[in-house]
Amino acid sequence: MSTAKDPGNGVYEILSLIFDFPSNEQRLWWHSTAPMFAAMLDNAGYNIHDQYRHLGIFKKHIIPFLGVYPTKDKERWLSILTRCGLPLELSLNCTDSVVRYTYEPINEVTGTEKDPFNTLAIMASVQKLAQIQAGIDLEWFSYFKDELTLDESESATLQSNELVKEQIKTQNKLALDLKESQFALKVYFYPHLKSIATGKSTHDLIFDSVFKLSQKHDSIQPAFQVLCDYVSRRNHSAESDQHIALHARLLSCDLIDPAKSRVKIYLLEKTVSLSVMEDLWTLGGQRVDASTMDGLDMLRELWSLLKVPTGHLEYPKGYLELGEIPNEQLPSMANYTLHHNNPMPEPQVYFTVFGMNDAEISNALTIFFQRHGFDDMAKKYRVFLQDSYPYHDFESLNYLHAYISFSYRRNKPYLSVYLHTFETGRWPVVADSPISFDAYRRCDLSTK
């Protein structure tokens, strides 16, 4: 009998006894992901009532939009959210103890003739969430969706002419930041398919859409102009000194009152090095205030601790097979937040640690937490991760961490981890199962 600790401290187990599921697919999604979700809420210090609320929302309003449960022998919609196409990812702001999850809404018509490129499911999902959370505003959602995703005519044209050859077809996803008993909703847009339909680059679609928005909301114009100038200089210099140009990959915004919402532009950085990350952080030397430089010192410290390999990298064009152990390194990324009435865009940089040893990453983060006074997280983080995958050989894993993001504001670091969220806790896997990462576990969930 295994003595592995149960993630969730009882909340997951109790809800599993209570919940009924309308399909086996939803039951599998719950038992695969809820153990880690429950453990993360508990370790981040959410009170017991909020843990039940957020897990209840997850079961009722999110799991129905995750599609078929992934197995190697079953066709499914592949999401850009993870390297093996899973449509869900948990993340944790370790320095602020905020739990978050991101998902690509999927429904029964996703990938069919009615919705070949998954344009529609997000609308139904947003409407469900707007019914249970006050303050959700869809003005900027509607604007960017029109600007950056396919309309019905474009979708039909791409489908009928077989113009989409790529395996990656995600256009949008949602994220919930869990704040005590409430959540803040964000949306992300990937305009790659819109680029195919219109002939405009993904980069131009994103920057043009923000430019038009800034004409109406001029309070974001100063920060946007600074970002435009920086990207233009970087891309111009790419011709002379062989640096790789920056290109916008995706965009996000908060689904709240536009007067308070933030726009984030995500730039793909194909050169992975400390000097390039320093350039991204300071906007080529434009941000040199005391707070920026304090953050830069911590960024350098993280770089030294994590030991990310350097190089010039391309983002893969396809997905890893489910259960495939990665043997790859991803390019880097940074996002820039455009705040109202702030003349300078705020950077957040990403350490792409996918494919690196998870035990070593956990140890590096623990040292960082210890050095900067996050003692509780230093004690809990590695234990939480091991307990979420109790039957794996933790020392040999290299796919639990996808990214580590870092920003610095109000004189403190904001560090988040983005984690593989699949078959967590006591997930039942047998030797001839077509799923999982070859971990053998024994737990009968057939009655739950």
Curated annotation (Swiss-Prot):
GO MF, one example: tryptophan dimethylallyltransferase activity
Pathway in which the depicted protein is active: Alkaloid biosynthesis; ergot alkaloid biosynthesis
Residues given in the record as substrate binding sites: R100, K186, Y188, R262, K264, Y266, Q348, Y350, Y414, Y418
Binding positions for L-tryptophan per the UniProt entry: I80, L81, E89, Y190, R249
InterPro entries reported in the protein's UniProt record: Aro_prenylTrfase, Aro_prenylTrfase_DMATS, DMATS-type_fun, Trp_dimethylallylTrfase
Transferase found in the keyword field: yes
Keywords tagged on the record: Alkaloid metabolism, Transferase
Signal peptide extent: none
Reactions listed under catalytic activity: L-tryptophan + dimethylallyl diphosphate = 4-(3-methylbut-2-enyl)-L-tryptophan + diphosphate
Assembly: Homodimer.
EC number, UniProt record: 2.5.1.34
Protein source organism: Claviceps purpurea (strain 20.1)
Name of the molecule in the record: Tryptophan dimethylallyltransferase 1
Name of a matching Pfam family: Trp_DMAT
